Every structure is written in structure tokens, then in C-alpha cells.
Amino acid sequence: MSSLATTAGAVTTLADMVPRHDRVLPVDEALASLFPAAGLQRGHVIGCSGSAATSLALAVVARAATAGAWVAAVGMPTLGVEAAAEAGVPLARLVLVDIDESQPAASWAERVGAAADGFEIILTRPPHGAERMLRKVQQRLQARGVVLVAVSDAANDVASRQGRLACDVELATFTVEWLGIGTGHGGLVGRRVSVTSNGRRSPRPLRAELWLPGPEGRPGRVG
């Protein structure tokens, strides 16, 4: 925990150089139509679920990180830095934070709270058992103006975990097709994903067809 506190302190100093008056952090133009404000509003919770949840979450934070925002990935041990880089996230702006698996819920809440002091975006997968802590965590993030991007691979898990986070925007993904698979051979070069955006900040469902990733390796709009 001390290492995270040191990192957060250093990041806070650097983050002071980034204007905080801008209430909306940028997203890639391919994703902008999925957000009511065409970007990430500070203090909001974004839920990503379904077959391409992690890929979408990385795409969501990439543009803001490129623009200078710091991203903490808390409790996501399977998140690969190579995948993050391929999604466009500058690794110099990404810090991976482990949680104590012997007491995951308490450790998760503690690490997220500490990260809120120095990071503008927190990417995380809330562990089972954290439900009773979610409201307090969310209130702290809102007070700090931190964007929380919560990931769930199961589409129906968004209601049980992310739903209790009171997501401002919920992005559900469904893989439509993979590109590059021949007749029993060939490498995968792209994935077409259908994304639906709902949430308490969305007056109506919003939909988009995206490449996650596209043939060039980066996210993009289909068509």
C-alpha cells in the first residue's frame, strides 16, 4: 500500500499541471456518440460488460490518457500492458495496482480510495463482496472528480455488480464477428462488436458498431 501512496503522491503533483476545470475528458471520436456529453464526465461511473468489455474499457480511456490523464487499473491482474498499448493507452500514463486477494473487497475499496487522490481515471473490476462498500467508494470518487470505468465480462453481471455502482453510462458489448479466420486457418486481425449505451445519464439507448480492435490494430467505427 505504501508504494501506491508514493505513486499517487507523485501523480498528484503531475496531475496538478493538467487543467481540472474541464469537466469532460475526451474519448476517441469513434466512441463519442455513445456518451451523452461526447466524452467522460468527471465523477461519473462507466460500466463496460459483455464479450468485449475489457477491450472497450481500454478504448474508452485511451484518448484521455493520450491527452495527459493518469489511469490506475485496480484489481485487474489479467490486464496485459501489451493489450493496453495496442488499444492506444500510453503505458507511461497507466499504473497497475494489485489488491490483497485474501480480503479482496476491503483491499479493493482501500486501493481505489487511495488512487482517487492522484488519478483522473480508475479502471477496475469490483470483486464479489464489495457491494456494501460501493456507495462510499462512489461518493469519494465523485467528490474528487474521478472517472470510474468498471469492467464485467458477463453481460448479466452488470446488474448485480455495476448496477449497484449507479452507472451513469452502461456500455454492453456483443461480438458480431471476427475477421481473418479462413477455412480452418488464418490469424485473427479484427473483431466487429455491437455496443449499446444505456444509463441514468442517457435519455434513450444509443448504439454503435465498432472494431475492437480493427484491422489496423486500433478501435474504430464500422462503416
Where do the model's predicted regions map?
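A contiguous pocket-lining binding segment that forms or flanks enzyme active sites
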Residues: A116-A172
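Structural beta-strand/beta-sheet cores of well-ordered domains, especially the beta-sheet scaffolds
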Residues: H44, E120, R191-V193
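Detector for small/aliphatic-rich hydrophobic stretches
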Residues: M1-A73, G199, G223
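Structural alpha-beta junctions
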Residues: T66-W70, L91, A143-V147
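Solvent-exposed alpha-helices and their adjacent loops that cap or buttress functional pockets
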Residues: A38-Q41, A114-A116, Q142, H185-L188
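Phosphate-binding/switch region of NTP-binding enzymes
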Residues: D153-G223
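Signal for well-folded cores of large energy- and translation-related assemblies
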Residues: F35-P36, A65, A85, D117, ...
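Long, charge-dense
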Residues: W70-Q139
